[in-house]
Protein backbone atom coordinates (compact mmCIF):
# COMPACT_ATOMS: atom_id res chain seq x y z
CA UNK A 1 0.00 0.00 0.00
CA UNK A 2 1.32 3.45 -0.96
CA UNK A 3 0.87 6.08 1.74
CA UNK A 4 1.48 9.76 1.05
CA UNK A 5 0.18 13.22 1.82
CA UNK A 6 -2.46 14.55 -0.57
CA UNK A 7 -1.85 17.64 -2.70
CA UNK A 8 -3.23 20.14 -0.18
CA UNK A 9 -1.25 18.56 2.65
CA UNK A 10 1.94 18.67 0.58
CA UNK A 11 1.30 22.35 -0.16
CA UNK A 12 0.82 23.03 3.55
CA UNK A 13 4.05 21.17 4.32
CA UNK A 14 6.00 23.26 1.81
CA UNK A 15 4.46 26.50 3.07
CA UNK A 16 5.29 25.66 6.69
CA UNK A 17 8.82 24.56 5.84
CA UNK A 18 9.45 27.93 4.20
CA UNK A 19 7.77 29.80 7.06
CA UNK A 20 9.70 28.13 9.88
CA UNK A 21 13.01 28.43 8.01
CA UNK A 22 12.78 32.24 8.10
CA UNK A 23 10.88 32.70 11.37
CA UNK A 24 13.91 33.23 13.64
CA UNK A 25 17.08 35.26 13.25
CA UNK A 26 20.48 33.76 14.04
CA UNK A 27 20.63 35.77 17.27
CA UNK A 28 17.19 34.53 18.31
CA UNK A 29 18.26 30.94 17.68
CA UNK A 30 21.37 31.41 19.79
CA UNK A 31 19.36 32.91 22.64
CA UNK A 32 16.67 30.23 22.68
CA UNK A 33 19.29 27.48 22.70
CA UNK A 34 20.03 28.39 26.33
CA UNK A 35 17.01 30.41 27.46
CA UNK A 36 14.23 28.10 26.30
CA UNK A 37 11.30 30.00 27.81
CA UNK A 38 12.49 33.59 27.98
CA UNK A 39 11.35 36.82 26.36
CA UNK A 40 12.71 35.90 22.93
CA UNK A 41 10.83 32.61 22.95
CA UNK A 42 7.60 34.34 23.97
CA UNK A 43 8.04 36.90 21.19
CA UNK A 44 8.46 34.11 18.64
CA UNK A 45 5.28 32.43 19.88
CA UNK A 46 3.40 35.74 19.62
CA UNK A 47 4.74 36.05 16.08
CA UNK A 48 3.32 32.62 15.20
CA UNK A 49 0.01 33.60 16.77
CA UNK A 50 -0.11 36.88 14.86
CA UNK A 51 0.63 35.02 11.64
CA UNK A 52 -2.28 32.67 12.35
CA UNK A 53 -0.32 29.44 12.54
CA UNK A 54 -1.01 28.36 16.12
CA UNK A 55 -4.54 27.24 15.27
CA UNK A 56 -3.68 24.75 12.54
CA UNK A 57 -5.05 21.72 14.37
CA UNK A 58 -7.81 23.36 16.41
CA UNK A 59 -11.53 23.17 15.48
CA UNK A 60 -13.06 26.30 13.96
CA UNK A 61 -15.47 26.62 16.89
CA UNK A 62 -12.47 27.39 19.10
CA UNK A 63 -10.84 29.78 16.64
CA UNK A 64 -8.67 27.30 14.76
CA UNK A 65 -8.29 26.49 11.07
CA UNK A 66 -10.37 23.34 11.38
CA UNK A 67 -7.73 21.13 9.77
CA UNK A 68 -7.39 17.53 10.88
CA UNK A 69 -4.80 15.74 13.01
CA UNK A 70 -2.60 15.03 9.98
CA UNK A 71 -2.25 18.75 9.29
CA UNK A 72 -1.47 19.28 12.96
CA UNK A 73 1.31 16.69 12.70
CA UNK A 74 2.66 18.46 9.62
CA UNK A 75 2.77 21.70 11.61
CA UNK A 76 4.61 20.05 14.52
CA UNK A 77 7.01 18.15 12.25
CA UNK A 78 8.03 21.21 10.27
CA UNK A 79 8.61 23.23 13.44
CA UNK A 80 10.77 20.40 14.81
CA UNK A 81 12.71 20.14 11.55
CA UNK A 82 13.55 23.87 11.75
CA UNK A 83 14.33 23.59 15.50
CA UNK A 84 11.60 26.09 16.34
CA UNK A 85 10.28 25.52 19.83
CA UNK A 86 6.48 25.43 19.95
CA UNK A 87 4.37 26.14 23.03
CA UNK A 88 3.57 22.44 22.87
CA UNK A 89 2.25 21.93 26.40
CA UNK A 90 -0.08 24.90 26.05
CA UNK A 91 -1.13 24.46 22.44
CA UNK A 92 -1.19 20.70 21.95
CA UNK A 93 -2.08 19.28 25.36
CA UNK A 94 -3.73 21.80 27.69
CA UNK A 95 -5.69 23.50 24.91
CA UNK A 96 -7.32 20.32 23.52
CA UNK A 97 -8.02 19.06 27.06
CA UNK A 98 -9.73 22.35 27.94
CA UNK A 99 -11.79 22.07 24.76
CA UNK A 100 -13.14 18.75 26.03
CA UNK A 101 -13.36 19.25 29.80
CA UNK A 102 -13.27 23.00 30.42
CA UNK A 103 -16.22 25.16 31.42
CA UNK A 104 -17.56 27.74 28.99
CA UNK A 105 -15.95 30.43 31.14
CA UNK A 106 -12.57 28.67 31.01
CA UNK A 107 -12.78 28.14 27.26
CA UNK A 108 -13.70 31.75 26.50
CA UNK A 109 -10.90 33.08 28.72
CA UNK A 110 -8.00 30.76 27.92
CA UNK A 111 -8.42 29.48 24.36
CA UNK A 112 -8.31 32.81 22.44
CA UNK A 113 -5.24 33.90 24.39
CA UNK A 114 -3.49 30.61 23.62
CA UNK A 115 -4.12 31.05 19.89
CA UNK A 116 -2.74 34.58 20.02
CA UNK A 117 0.45 33.30 21.64
CA UNK A 118 -0.15 35.50 24.67
CA UNK A 119 -0.68 32.86 27.35
CA UNK A 120 1.51 29.98 28.47
CA UNK A 121 0.88 26.95 30.69
CA UNK A 122 3.26 24.65 32.52
CA UNK A 123 2.34 21.17 33.76
CA UNK A 124 2.60 20.52 37.50
CA UNK A 125 2.56 16.72 37.87
CA UNK A 126 5.90 15.24 38.99
CA UNK A 127 6.87 15.42 42.66
CA UNK A 128 10.25 14.93 44.37
CA UNK A 129 9.50 11.67 46.19
CA UNK A 130 7.12 9.90 43.81
CA UNK A 131 9.22 9.17 40.75
CA UNK A 132 7.01 8.03 37.90
CA UNK A 133 4.14 7.03 40.19
CA UNK A 134 2.02 10.08 39.43
CA UNK A 135 -0.99 8.73 41.29
CA UNK A 136 0.97 8.90 44.56
CA UNK A 137 1.11 12.70 44.41
CA UNK A 138 0.91 14.49 47.77
CA UNK A 139 0.27 18.12 46.83
CA UNK A 140 -3.04 18.83 48.54
CA UNK A 141 -5.92 21.20 47.89
CA UNK A 142 -8.48 21.83 50.63
CA UNK A 143 -11.80 23.48 49.81
CA UNK A 144 -12.39 26.76 51.64
CA UNK A 145 -15.61 28.34 50.43
CA UNK A 146 -15.06 29.63 46.90
CA UNK A 147 -11.37 28.70 46.94
CA UNK A 148 -9.01 25.75 47.15
CA UNK A 149 -6.01 26.17 49.46
CA UNK A 150 -3.03 24.44 47.80
CA UNK A 151 0.13 23.24 49.55
CA UNK A 152 2.91 21.10 48.12
CA UNK A 153 5.84 20.91 45.74
CA UNK A 154 6.39 19.81 42.14
CA UNK A 155 9.63 19.12 40.33
CA UNK A 156 10.81 19.23 36.72
CA UNK A 157 8.05 21.69 35.87
CA UNK A 158 8.98 22.65 32.31
CA UNK A 159 8.70 26.40 31.84
CA UNK A 160 7.38 26.95 35.35
CA UNK A 161 9.45 30.12 35.75
CA UNK A 162 7.87 31.85 32.77
CA UNK A 163 4.39 30.30 32.65
CA UNK A 164 1.30 32.39 33.27
CA UNK A 165 -0.58 29.41 34.69
CA UNK A 166 0.21 25.96 36.07
CA UNK A 167 -1.99 23.00 35.10
CA UNK A 168 -1.73 21.45 38.54
CA UNK A 169 -2.60 17.94 39.71
CA UNK A 170 -3.63 17.99 43.38
CA UNK A 171 -5.13 15.58 45.87
CA UNK A 172 -8.56 16.77 46.96
CA UNK A 173 -9.67 13.58 48.74
CA UNK A 174 -6.82 12.07 50.81
CA UNK A 175 -8.97 9.11 51.84
CA UNK A 176 -9.77 7.94 48.30
CA UNK A 177 -7.75 5.28 46.43
CA UNK A 178 -4.65 6.84 44.91
CA UNK A 179 -5.98 7.03 41.34
CA UNK A 180 -9.10 8.71 42.67
CA UNK A 181 -9.42 11.83 44.76
CA UNK A 182 -7.21 13.77 42.32
CA UNK A 183 -8.30 17.04 40.72
CA UNK A 184 -6.89 19.48 38.18
CA UNK A 185 -6.61 23.14 39.14
CA UNK A 186 -5.39 26.06 37.07
CA UNK A 187 -3.02 28.10 39.24
CA UNK A 188 -2.18 31.71 38.38
CA UNK A 189 1.58 32.07 38.87
CA UNK A 190 1.03 35.64 40.12
CA UNK A 191 -0.86 34.35 43.15
CA UNK A 192 0.78 34.77 46.57
CA UNK A 193 2.39 31.54 47.77
CA UNK A 194 3.61 30.37 44.37
CA UNK A 195 7.39 30.28 43.84
CA UNK A 196 10.05 28.42 41.89
CA UNK A 197 13.74 27.62 41.81
CA UNK A 198 15.64 26.78 38.60
CA UNK A 199 16.90 23.36 37.59
CA UNK A 200 19.73 23.56 35.04
CA UNK A 201 19.81 20.42 32.94
CA UNK A 202 22.80 18.72 31.32
CA UNK A 203 22.39 20.73 28.11
CA UNK A 204 23.24 23.87 30.07
CA UNK A 205 19.80 25.38 29.56
CA UNK A 206 17.18 26.58 32.01
CA UNK A 207 13.85 25.16 30.98
CA UNK A 208 12.66 23.23 34.05
CA UNK A 209 12.06 24.20 37.67
CA UNK A 210 11.02 23.07 41.09
CA UNK A 211 7.74 24.82 41.90
CA UNK A 212 6.31 25.45 45.37
CA UNK A 213 2.79 26.07 46.61
CA UNK A 214 2.36 27.56 50.08
CA UNK A 215 -1.26 28.30 50.98
CA UNK A 216 -2.01 29.33 47.40
CA UNK A 217 -5.65 30.36 47.12
CA UNK A 218 -7.08 29.09 43.85
CA UNK A 219 -10.61 30.17 42.87
CA UNK A 220 -13.00 27.23 42.68
CA UNK A 221 -13.94 28.22 39.12
CA UNK A 222 -10.40 27.23 38.15
CA UNK A 223 -11.23 23.57 38.79
CA UNK A 224 -11.16 21.74 35.45
CA UNK A 225 -13.69 18.95 35.08
CA UNK A 226 -15.20 17.22 38.09
CA UNK A 227 -13.61 17.37 41.54
CA UNK A 228 -11.85 14.12 42.49
CA UNK A 229 -12.03 12.85 38.89
CA UNK A 230 -8.88 14.47 37.55
CA UNK A 231 -7.15 11.22 36.59
CA UNK A 232 -9.21 11.14 33.41
CA UNK A 233 -7.93 14.59 32.47
CA UNK A 234 -4.36 13.62 33.28
CA UNK A 235 -4.45 10.59 30.99
CA UNK A 236 -6.08 12.62 28.20
CA UNK A 237 -3.44 15.34 28.50
CA UNK A 238 -0.56 12.85 28.67
CA UNK A 239 -1.76 11.00 25.56
CA UNK A 240 -1.61 14.28 23.63
CA UNK A 241 1.82 15.00 25.13
CA UNK A 242 3.25 11.59 24.22
CA UNK A 243 2.23 12.00 20.60
CA UNK A 244 3.97 15.39 20.41
CA UNK A 245 7.20 13.92 21.85
CA UNK A 246 7.83 11.83 18.72
CA UNK A 247 7.68 14.10 15.64
CA UNK A 248 9.56 12.81 12.61
CA UNK A 249 10.65 16.37 11.85
CA UNK A 250 13.14 16.21 14.71
CA UNK A 251 14.93 13.40 12.87
CA UNK A 252 14.55 15.22 9.56
CA UNK A 253 16.26 18.31 10.97
CA UNK A 254 19.14 16.17 12.21
CA UNK A 255 19.52 14.65 8.75
CA UNK A 256 19.47 18.06 7.06
CA UNK A 257 22.22 19.43 9.32
CA UNK A 258 24.62 16.52 8.92
CA UNK A 259 23.91 15.91 5.22
CA UNK A 260 24.63 19.56 4.40
CA UNK A 261 27.89 19.40 6.34
CA UNK A 262 28.94 16.08 4.79
CA UNK A 263 28.19 17.29 1.26
CA UNK A 264 30.21 20.46 1.79
CA UNK A 265 33.17 18.38 2.99
CA UNK A 266 32.97 15.79 0.18
CA UNK A 267 32.13 12.99 2.62
CA UNK A 268 28.97 11.51 1.10
CA UNK A 269 30.88 8.59 -0.41
CA UNK A 270 32.49 7.62 2.91
CA UNK A 271 30.98 4.29 3.93
CA UNK A 272 30.28 5.15 7.56
CA UNK A 273 28.83 8.55 6.64
CA UNK A 274 26.51 7.06 4.02
CA UNK A 275 25.42 4.30 6.39
CA UNK A 276 24.60 6.75 9.18
CA UNK A 277 22.72 9.10 6.87
CA UNK A 278 20.76 6.24 5.29
CA UNK A 279 19.71 4.98 8.71
CA UNK A 280 18.66 8.49 9.69
CA UNK A 281 16.57 8.99 6.55
CA UNK A 282 14.95 5.56 6.87
CA UNK A 283 14.13 6.16 10.53
CA UNK A 284 12.58 9.51 9.66
CA UNK A 285 10.32 7.76 7.15
CA UNK A 286 9.23 5.11 9.64
CA UNK A 287 8.60 7.74 12.30
CA UNK A 288 6.58 9.80 9.81
CA UNK A 289 4.40 6.82 8.92
CA UNK A 290 3.83 6.19 12.62
CA UNK A 291 2.83 9.85 13.07
CA UNK A 292 0.37 9.58 10.20
CA UNK A 293 -1.08 6.34 11.53
CA UNK A 294 -1.79 7.95 14.90
CA UNK A 295 -3.15 11.09 13.22
CA UNK A 296 -5.45 9.12 10.92
CA UNK A 297 -6.85 7.15 13.88
CA UNK A 298 -7.26 10.37 15.86
CA UNK A 299 -9.47 11.78 13.09
CA UNK A 300 -12.32 9.50 14.18
CA UNK A 301 -11.60 8.77 17.86
CA UNK A 302 -9.64 10.06 20.86
CA UNK A 303 -5.91 9.42 20.90
CA UNK A 304 -5.34 5.70 21.54
CA UNK A 305 -3.22 5.01 24.63
CA UNK A 306 -1.09 2.34 22.95
CA UNK A 307 -0.57 4.40 19.79
CA UNK A 308 0.46 7.46 21.79
CA UNK A 309 2.91 5.40 23.83
CA UNK A 310 4.33 3.64 20.76
CA UNK A 311 4.98 6.96 19.05
CA UNK A 312 6.73 8.27 22.13
CA UNK A 313 8.91 5.17 22.65
CA UNK A 314 9.98 4.88 19.02
CA UNK A 315 10.72 8.56 18.49
CA UNK A 316 12.53 9.14 21.78
CA UNK A 317 14.80 6.09 21.59
CA UNK A 318 15.65 6.29 17.90
CA UNK A 319 16.56 9.98 18.04
CA UNK A 320 19.04 9.29 20.83
CA UNK A 321 20.67 6.46 18.86
CA UNK A 322 20.93 8.62 15.74
CA UNK A 323 22.48 11.58 17.53
CA UNK A 324 25.06 9.28 19.09
CA UNK A 325 25.95 7.79 15.73
CA UNK A 326 26.12 11.10 13.87
CA UNK A 327 28.18 12.73 16.61
CA UNK A 328 30.72 9.95 16.05
CA UNK A 329 30.70 10.62 12.30
CA UNK A 330 31.34 14.34 12.73
CA UNK A 331 33.98 13.70 15.38
CA UNK A 332 35.76 11.15 13.18
CA UNK A 333 35.82 13.16 9.96
CA UNK A 334 35.59 16.76 11.15
CA UNK A 335 38.09 19.31 12.36
CA UNK A 336 36.81 21.26 15.36
CA UNK A 337 39.24 24.05 14.52
CA UNK A 338 37.03 24.75 11.50
CA UNK A 339 34.12 27.07 12.49
CA UNK A 340 31.44 25.24 10.48
CA UNK A 341 32.35 21.87 11.99
CA UNK A 342 32.68 23.32 15.48
CA UNK A 343 29.23 24.89 15.18
CA UNK A 344 27.67 21.62 14.04
CA UNK A 345 29.42 19.63 16.78
CA UNK A 346 28.23 22.08 19.43
CA UNK A 347 24.66 21.89 18.09
CA UNK A 348 24.73 18.09 18.07
CA UNK A 349 26.07 18.03 21.63
CA UNK A 350 23.32 20.29 22.96
CA UNK A 351 20.55 18.48 21.08
CA UNK A 352 21.81 15.03 22.12
CA UNK A 353 21.78 16.05 25.78
CA UNK A 354 18.38 17.70 25.45
CA UNK A 355 16.89 14.59 23.88
CA UNK A 356 17.78 12.49 26.92
CA UNK A 357 14.67 13.84 28.62
CA UNK A 358 12.43 12.34 25.96
CA UNK A 359 12.69 8.81 27.36
CA UNK A 360 11.11 9.86 30.65
CA UNK A 361 9.28 13.11 29.88
CA UNK A 362 5.56 12.40 29.57
CA UNK A 363 6.03 9.06 31.33
CA UNK A 364 9.11 6.81 31.36
CA UNK A 365 9.46 4.39 28.46
CA UNK A 366 9.33 1.33 30.72
CA UNK A 367 5.79 2.32 31.68
CA UNK A 368 4.98 3.17 28.05
CA UNK A 369 5.90 -0.38 27.07
CA UNK A 370 3.52 -1.72 29.69
CA UNK A 371 0.75 0.54 28.37
CA UNK A 372 1.39 -0.77 24.86
CA UNK A 373 1.30 -4.36 26.11
CA UNK A 374 -1.87 -3.97 28.18
CA UNK A 375 -3.89 -1.56 26.05
CA UNK A 376 -2.59 -2.45 22.61
CA UNK A 377 -1.86 -6.17 22.82
CA UNK A 378 -4.23 -7.25 25.58
CA UNK A 379 -1.45 -8.70 27.74
CA UNK A 380 -1.76 -8.88 31.53
CA UNK A 381 -0.41 -6.07 33.66
CA UNK A 382 2.93 -6.70 35.37
CA UNK A 383 2.38 -7.73 39.02
CA UNK A 384 3.51 -5.19 41.62
Predicted regions and their residues:
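Glycine-rich phosphate/cofactor-binding loops in nucleotide/flavin-utilizing enzymes
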Residues: 2, 70, 74-75, 93, ...
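Short, charged, amphipathic alpha-helical segments
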Residues: 274-279, 305-313
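Glycine-rich phosphate/pyrophosphate-binding beta-alpha loops
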Residues: 155-160, 202-203, 357-362
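A short, Trp-centered hydrophobic/proline-enriched beta-strand micro-motif
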Residues: 117-125, 169
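Internal helix-loop-helix
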Residues: 49-117, 159-165, 284, 291, ...
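Glycine-rich beta->alpha junctions and the first turn(s) of the following alpha-helix
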Residues: 2-7, 11, 194-288, 358
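A short core secondary-structure module
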Residues: 147, 151-197
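A structural signal for short hydrophobic beta-strand segments in well-ordered beta-sheet cores
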Residues: 139-142
Amino acid sequence: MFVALNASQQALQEELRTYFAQLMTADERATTTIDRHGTVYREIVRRMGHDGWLGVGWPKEFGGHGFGPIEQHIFVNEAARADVQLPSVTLQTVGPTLQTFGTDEQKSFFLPKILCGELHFAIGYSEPDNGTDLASLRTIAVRDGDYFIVNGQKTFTTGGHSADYIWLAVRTDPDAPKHKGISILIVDTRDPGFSWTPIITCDGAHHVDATYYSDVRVPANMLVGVENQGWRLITAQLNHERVMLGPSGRIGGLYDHVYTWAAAHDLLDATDVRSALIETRATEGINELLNWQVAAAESSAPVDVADASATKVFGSERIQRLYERLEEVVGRHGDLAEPVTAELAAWLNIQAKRNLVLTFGGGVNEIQRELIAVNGLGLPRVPR
